[in-house]
């Protein structure tokens, strides 16, 4: 086992490598550098972004379902009637619009 670890931890001398292996190692180093630069350049959303848009869509759905299931539209807000559907769909649409900004 120690011999395997020693072989894995050994570094290759570039003078002993074939030109093909040297080119392959150089390409790999360039690819690694390019990927690391790309990752550094990406922007990400705050941690609260995904739970917020999921919550908005779920609350909007629950709002619409409660309006449909309540007798004579007396819930969630009794005095506005069918505008309860507008509120529910607005919450859902805000959640969907937020998904477009998700990275």
UniProtKB/Swiss-Prot annotation:
GO biological process: cell division
Transmembrane segments: 49-69, 80-100
Entry keyword set: Cell cycle, Cell division, Cell membrane, Membrane, Transmembrane, Transmembrane helix
Key word Transmembrane present: yes
GO cellular component: plasma membrane
Record has Transmembrane helix as a keyword: yes
Family: Belongs to the CrgA family.
Protein name in the entry: Cell division protein CrgA
Function description: Involved in cell division.
